[in-house]
Amino acid sequence: MKSFLVDQDGYYGEFGGAYVPEILHKCVEELQNTYLDVIESEDFKKEFDQLLRDYVGRPSPLYPARRLSEKYGCKMYLKREDLNHTGAHKINNTIGQILLARRMGKKRIIAETGAGQHGVATATVCALMNMECIVYMGKTDVERQHINVEKMKMLGATVVPVTSGNMTLKDATNEAIRDWCCHPSDTYYIIGSTVGPHPYPDMVARLQSVISEEIKKQLQEKEGRDYPDYLIACVGGGSNAAGTIYHYIDDERVRIVLAEAGGKGIETGMTAATIQLGKMGIIHGARTFVIQNEDGQIEEPYSISAGLDYPGIGPMHANLADKKRAMVLAVNDDEAIRAAYELTRLEGIIPALESAHALGALEKITFKPEDVVVLTVSGRGDKDIETYLG
């Protein structure tokens, strides 16, 4: 049976690969040749696990959401990534990659960020490990995620506002790649999602796979079986979804539901529903679905959530959708906000806008009472309070 995980050439089916400018060939190749040896080594695992436990506060709870279960007629569990240090799943990946960068002798860490969660997580771990940190962030996002910008500065990072294009995540990523091209030898570029050239999508998925590793153990304890009927997660680039499904990706008993950002509606042109609207293309070094116009130019995506407005999608998820392994639902802005309020009023948990898209998918699915459903709350909603109240 063919696996839905990456093959030895860095592809998921026909998606993925590494399409990078000549100047970065060496960096990317060095990473491809190093990452598995390092992250599978005993001393890396030991240090990574210890930091996840003592610093991040893992394992994160698998919370039986009683009132949400009653509303949707199933057994609903929430995987609480919002309870991690820094408030989201992002830190699982930043700790792993910065440990790798340190072992590769890199001195300077650069990152891109949309909602600011990956930026904060990167700045946090750089402070912990005494590394220089530069974060690229679109000017639009700097304005709408002001509090995260202040946190990064307090942590000692340099935040560079990017003023090209739509001034959001795509543009921040372009700028970070430019920086990497200028400083290939001493700089490590830490990508925050399962996007970019191979090995990034696989590396980020492996570092985030701690999520599904814990779900297996926790379900065994709570349900007497280690798999759910449904796994539900939001996708922008796809890292929290990749972590949620990693250990179940080839298990046909488990249905995978991915919620992407519908924006103002997929027919409005104001959307980030890449899987439903995208055509095959290349973005940031990987072949995947990309929202583009007739001439193949990348379109500006839109979502109320700064963490989901990316015009591409991780190659793992593109392949899952293409092969019909995952069900993909577009959740609009107002559906996400409604779902966030519902979780807050039913369970007393304020989710991030990104996670609210996963919650917004619930009303689009018909569950059976015995269905065990695990939904990942990828982050907490503190950063989005103004949007919710607006």
Curated annotation (Swiss-Prot):
GO molecular function ontology, one term from the record: tryptophan synthase activity
EC number(s) from the headed UniProt entry: 4.2.1.20
N6-(pyridoxal phosphate)lysine carried by residues: 90
Pathway: Amino-acid biosynthesis; L-tryptophan biosynthesis; L-tryptophan from chorismate: step 5/5
Family, per entry: Belongs to the TrpB family.
PANTHER family noted in UniProt: TRYPTOPHAN SYNTHASE, TRYPTOPHAN SYNTHASE-RELATED
Subunit structure and binding partners: Tetramer of two alpha and two beta chains.
Function: The beta subunit is responsible for the synthesis of L-tryptophan from indole and L-serine.
Name of the protein in question: Tryptophan synthase beta chain
Lineage per the UniProt record: Bacteria, Pseudomonadati, Bacteroidota, Bacteroidia, Bacteroidales
Gene that encodes it: trpB
